[in-house]
């Protein structure tokens, strides 16, 4: 949360499975739409929070399978763990962890729940120090929830029980849960003088319901929400104008909520097909780089006309003296790399070629110059290659827009230089 000097314009809190991540959408179309919107318009002054029932290790595994952005905060294990960063570099909130120790004894919870044969323990990867998880049917869950808290209270353990998706049963410390974790984070921001202008919570299942109970937040239940959440809405929130049931699934429903509540820009750059003017907004470096790489993706996929006018437009965006340093170390003028794009037109059409940018930041380093930094991910034939990217941009009065002066990339992780002739920009 220290990334922002002032109060966040928006805190967007999203459940993952079946909310931000649509498991019925193998192409990740709406997730990529959300990614482009967030990086172009929100990353610079807002906070992205993932709030999931998954353990942190399970969440990390999902990041390797889906094009998830790096959040500012990851709330995992149904609110029993808070991690700042949520990517490769993370810091756990030890104060929150210590709070959850109050009237909590995991050994006693395990001992007492073993006496309920209907409770089937979930795999070890789903178990955490402050979360004991089971599978159980709805009717059995209702009966167990009536008696288990009292049994544990007699042994000095104060718990919260969360049932979701028609099968997941979690035993947590009383102060845990998604509501408790988010309330804690909002209180921290308030103490620091960084109370957000708006907060939007997004969910689809029973363990998300308590998020909508937090005062002064906006809430969206995506169209594919589970019956247990819809029932909660009918009984508790149908008259609350700040909470609504979207008509769109998953990420599309989240974008719909941003529009409905007038929380800020709500048109994803992926929904803009103006290839005649594909450069970004005049003084928004984040929007500039997102739009640039979206056009590059569309060129590689053959989704725009193969016309020299587009390549000339690209050249007009960059300085004739501009240099691109390829992640392999090869340096050539940007215009020469643009010329090489002609040979790659449409080569990604059958390869499910996609590009997304993550963690886009920009610094105003002089009166007319910006330095944009981000991670570029490129997916082709199921393989993701990633590089850190720096772009130097200068505002040219005569063009009334930003000009690309220099691009420098470096490979990340296990990304390699195989087929490096097909890696441009």
UniProtKB/Swiss-Prot annotation:
Recorded GO MF terms: magnesium ion binding; sucrose-phosphate phosphatase activity
Transmembrane segments: none
Sorted UniProt keywords: Hydrolase, Magnesium
Reaction it catalyzes: sucrose 6(F)-phosphate + H2O = sucrose + phosphate
Record-linked InterPro entries: HAD-like_sf (IPR036412), HAD-SF_hydro_IIB (IPR006379), HAD_sf (IPR023214), NTF2-like_dom_sf (IPR032710), SPP-like_dom (IPR006380), SPP_C (IPR013679), Sucrose_Phosphatase (IPR051518), Sucrose_phosphatase_pln/cyn (IPR012847)
Classification via Gene3D superfamilies: 3.10.450.50, 3.90.1070.10, HAD superfamily/HAD-like (3.40.50.1000)
SUPFAM superfamilies the record matches: HAD-like, NTF2-like
Record carries keyword Magnesium: yes
GO BP terms, alphabetized: sucrose biosynthetic process
EC number: 3.1.3.24
Pathway: Glycan biosynthesis; sucrose biosynthesis; sucrose from D-fructose 6-phosphate and UDP-alpha-D-glucose: step 2/2
Cofactor or coenzyme needed: Mg(2+)
Keyword Repeat among record annotations: no
PANTHER family per the UniProt record, alphabetical: SUCROSE-PHOSPHATASE 2-RELATED, SUCROSE-PHOSPHATASE 3A-RELATED
Similarity annotation: Belongs to the sucrose phosphatase family.
Self-association and partners: Homodimer.
Function: Catalyzes the final step of sucrose synthesis.
Record protein name field: Probable sucrose-phosphatase 3a
């Amino acid at each position: 949360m220290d990334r922002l000097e002032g109060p966040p314009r928006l805190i967007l809190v999203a459940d993952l499975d079946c909310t931000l991540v649509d498991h019925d959408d193998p192409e990740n179309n709406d997730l990529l739409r959300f990614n482009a919107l967030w990086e172009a318009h929100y990353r610079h002054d807002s906070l992205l929070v993932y709030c999931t029932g998954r353990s942190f290790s399970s969440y990390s595994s999902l990041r390797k399978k889906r094009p998830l952005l790096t959040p500012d905060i990851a709330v995992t294990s149904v609110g029993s763990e808070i991690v700042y960063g949520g990517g490769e570099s993370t810091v756990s909130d030890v104060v929150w962890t210590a709070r959850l120790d109050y009237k909590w004894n995991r050994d006693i919870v395990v001992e007492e729940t073993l006496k309920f044969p209907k409770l089937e323990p979930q795999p070890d990867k789903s178990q955490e120090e402050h979360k004991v998880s089971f599978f159980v049917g709805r009717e059995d869950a209702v009966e167990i929830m009536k008696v288990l808290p009292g049994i544990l209270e007699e042994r000095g353990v104060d718990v919260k029980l969360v049932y979701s998706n028609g099968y997941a049963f979690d035993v947590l410390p009383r102060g845990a849960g998604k509501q408790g974790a988010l309330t804690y984070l909002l209180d921290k921001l308030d103490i620091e003088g960084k109370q957000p202008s708006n907060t939007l919570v997004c969910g689809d299942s029973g363990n998300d319901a308590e998020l909508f109970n937090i005062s002064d937040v906006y809430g969206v239940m995506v169209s594919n929400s589970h019956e247990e959440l819809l029932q909660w809405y009918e009984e508790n929130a149908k008259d609350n104008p700040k909470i609504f049931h979207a008509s769109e699934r998953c990420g599309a429903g989240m974008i719909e909520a941003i529009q409905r509540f007038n929380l800020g820009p709500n048109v994803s750059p992926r929904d803009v097909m103006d290839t005649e003017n594909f450069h970004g907004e005049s003084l928004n470096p984040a929007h500039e780089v997102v739009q640039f790489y979206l056009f590059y993706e569309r060129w590689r996929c053959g989704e725009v006309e193969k016309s020299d006018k587009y390549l000339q437009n690209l050249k007009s965006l960059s300085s004739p003296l501009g240099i691109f340093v390829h992640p392999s170390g090869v340096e050539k003028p940007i215009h020469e790399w643009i010329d090489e794009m002609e040979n790659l037109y449409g080569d990604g059409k059958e390869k499910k070629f996609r590009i997304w940018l993550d963690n886009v930041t920009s610094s105003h380093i002089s009166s007319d110059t910006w330095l944009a930094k981000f991670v570029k991910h490129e997916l082709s034939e199921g393989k993701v290659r990633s590089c850190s990217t720096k772009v130097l941009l200068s505002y040219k009065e005569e063009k009334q827009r930003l000009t690309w002066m220099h691009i420098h990339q470096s490979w990340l992780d296990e990304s390699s230089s195989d087929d490096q002739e097909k890696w441009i920009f």
